[in-house]
Structure formats: structure tokens, C-alpha cells
Amino acid sequence: MAAPDQVRGGVLVRSAFAHEGAARLLVHRLKYEAVAGMANRMAVALEPLLGVEAKALVPIPRVIARRWKYGIDPAAALATALARRAEIPVVHCLRAHFWVRRRAGTSASPRILPSFRLRVPTPVGAVLIDDVVTTGTTLVAASSTTGSRLAITFTASGSRG
């Protein structure tokens, strides 16, 4: 089932699917099993979400410790696969922290707000890329750092806002 466009903290978020069923399984295989080939399949669904204004793709990086643990940065894999299809560059503008407490899931524990540092200037027409949007706080933090107001994700779940 397709997810409707939404605005989260001033960021327009376009998602290919709701975070359920087969789409959720694809995200899980990419994110936690490091099946990198999933990114190519997922990019097929993401390409129509890019507008003509998209001039560069900026993946929202996974925390370094999780990249090591799971062997993949899902947003970078998606951005790379999508860039090949759309023939636009990937620019790694954002630097993630080494480690932060886990935010995803249903735990009622207080959330740690994500933050990023800018590695290189953000190009005009940059589109943020991530695998899934839940509350939108990660996208908003990335947007605050880069200035980009458009994000493309494979799936969307969680609260709207």
C-alpha cells in the first residue's frame, strides 16, 4: 500500500509504501541482514518519487556502530542504487555520531534526538534519502543540518506530524 506524502517538521516526505507487509520485509532484509541487492529493487519504487528539482541525493547516515554491527548503511545503499537509476550524484554531506541509544521501536523510554554534522556543503536541489520514516525526528535533524526540505523514504510508519 502506497504511503501518502506528508510534512514532518517542515520537511516534505515522500514514501513509496507504508511500513507493512512485503515492504517492511525488504527494509528489514536490507537494514538488519545486509542484503545489499535489496537496495536495487527498492530504488525502482523510489525513482518516481524524485521530482525534476532533484539534483543530488544525500543519504541520512546510520550511526557508525550500527554500520559495523550490521555491515551496511541502508540509506547509503538506497541512495547509491537510486543515483544509478536517476543519473544524479550521491553527496555524503552528513556525518553521524559513533553511537547513540536506539530510538526505533515501541519502547516508552525517552528518545534521544538525533543530530548530524555537515561534512561538505549541501548542493542545491539535494534530496534526503532514508529507508524508513517513523516519527520524522531523524529527517528533521538531517534537514536542519543540510537545509534540504525534501526527503524520500522507502516506507513510512509511526505517528504523523
Annotate the PLM regions:
Residues 1-161:
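Glycine-rich phosphate/pyrophosphate-handling loop used in enzymes and phosphotransfer proteins
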